[in-house]
UniProtKB/Swiss-Prot annotation:
Full protein name: ORC1-type DNA replication protein 9
Top-level taxon of the source organism: Archaea
Lineage of the species this protein comes from: Archaea, Methanobacteriati, Methanobacteriota, Stenosarchaea group, Halobacteria
One biological process term in Gene Ontology: DNA replication
Keyword terms, alphabetized: ATP-binding, DNA replication, Nucleotide-binding, Plasmid
Effect of inactivating the gene: Not essential for normal growth in a single deletion. Required together with orc2 and orc10 in a minimal orc strain.
PANTHER family associated with the record: CELL DIVISION CONTROL PROTEIN 6-RELATED, ORC1-TYPE DNA REPLICATION PROTEIN
Role this protein plays: Involved in regulation of DNA replication.
Pfam family, one: AAA_22
Source organism (scientific name): Halobacterium salinarum (strain ATCC 700922 / JCM 11081 / NRC-1) (Halobacterium halobium)
Molecular functions per Gene Ontology: ATP binding; ATP hydrolysis activity
InterPro entries linked: AAA+_ATPase, AAA_22, Cdc6_lid, ORC1/CDC6, P-loop_NTPase
UniProt family annotation: Belongs to the CDC6/cdc18 family.
Coiled coil: none
Chain positions recorded as ATP binding sites: T63, G64, K65, T66, C67, Y195, R207
């Protein structure tokens, strides 16, 4: 049996679409040398067969937390034969079982695990018995875990090093017991700030060089994308991807200003929809309360939310949900902590100006 060669319609300006995707990890990262070196030093013991400290990587959305974590672990895998890495999105795998299952699945250890009947402790036992390469476990969006105690479980296993990624330390610490708070506070912290416009320009220029034909976008246009993204690399790359995709579909030879004008709004809408689709069930209920009745304060939101469910989460958890949705521009908050109110995000966000 012979395989037919698959041919694709050629792009007009996109040379490598992978480079424009949000999850792409480049061979070189821009303006994060200190953070890369810090995280690498935390993980170095595992390359010598020794336990490594847990690392906590924090910063606003779009500051490169996931990218840097994956970049460092990929570099480790290239340099050391007996080190592996696995990635878990805790927003998607938000229960203790799902997270443990995902890790074991990456190890090929889930053949006889039944989602409905296998107890959690058996999954931990399997991780304790795992005798494969030492492994770095990246827990992305770790503050989304329903039971953050899993961090303690993994931390106690010397075969694994753990990277915890979250927007804010306080959102993570507020939901764990004193034992784990003490452990986390003694962990190594890698903090990432929003990018400056000049740094975003360099990140965009690197993506253009790797993914697009020459001379399809100007330096001035990259500056305007950086300005519209306001320090958020994910949004900046999203604007570039949206503009390049539209120009390519229309068989343009370059990205024109008229295409760029609408790209920011389209990219924001795509990111917002992706974030909405990622909400776990109780977060979605909280969002619906704000959509139906907002603007509302946290106590009012909680009262409405409680009427919708039989097993409501705690007030503290709902406040964490509100904080998370604000960080990801699903909701917006106005006022001080005493009189704060939440509402849907205003859709009239800045565009890429001419």
């Amino acid at each position: 049996m012979t395989c037919r060669r698959i041919t694709f319609v050629p792009n007009f300006m996109i040379r490598d679409a992978r480079v424009l995707r949000a999850g792409f990890v480049p061979r070189e990262v821009e303006h994060r040398d200190a953070e890369v070196n810090h995280l690498s030093s935390v993980l170095e013991p595992i390359t010598n067969g020794e336990p490594a400290d847990t690392a906590i990587v924090t910063g606003p959305s779009g500051t490169g937390k996931t990218c840097i974590s994956q970049f460092v672990t990929e570099r480790l895998r290239e340099e050391v034969l007996n080190v592996e890495a696995t990635y878990v999105n805790c927003w998607r795998n938000y229960t203790r079982f799902r997270t443990l299952y995902q890790i074991l699945d990456d190890f090929g250890e889930t053949i006889d695990i039944h989602r409905q009947s296998t107890p959690h402790d058996e999954l931990i036992d399997r991780l304790q018995q795992y005798d494969g390469p030492r492994t770095v476990i990246i827990l992305d969006e770790v503050d989304q875990l329903e039971d953050p105690g899993i961090i303690y479980d993994l931390h106690s296993l010397p075969h694994f090093a753990v990277i915890c990624i979250a927007n804010k330390e306080e959102d993570l610490f507020s939901r764990v017991d004193d034992r784990l708070v003490s452990r986390l506070r003694s962990s190594e912290h890698v903090r990432m700030d929003k990018y400056h416009d000049e740094q975003l320009h360099d990140i965009l220029a690197a993506r253009v060089k790797g993914g697009l034909d020459q001379d399809v976008i100007t330096t001035n246009q990259l500056d305007r994308i950086a300005d519209a993204a306001a320090g958020d690399a994910r949004l900046a790359i999203g604007i570039l991807r949206t503009a390049a995709s539209k120009a390519d579909r229309e068989s343009r030879e370059r990205i024109t200003d008229d295409i760029l004008l609408n790209a920011a709004e389209d990219a924001r809408a795509q990111i917002k929809q992706k974030n909405l689709d990622s909400l776990i069930p109780h977060q979605r209920l909280v969002y619906d309360v704000v959509r139906e009745h907002g603007p509302l304060g946290p106590s009012e939101i909680y009262d409405h939310y409680k009427r919708k469910v039989d097993d409501p989460r705690t007030k503290r958890t709902i406040r964490t949900y509100l904080s998370k949705m604000t960080q990801y521009n699903v909701l917006e908050a106005e006022g001080t902590s005493r009189d704060r109110e939440y509402s849907l995000v205003d859709s009239t966000a800045p565009s890429v100006t001419q």
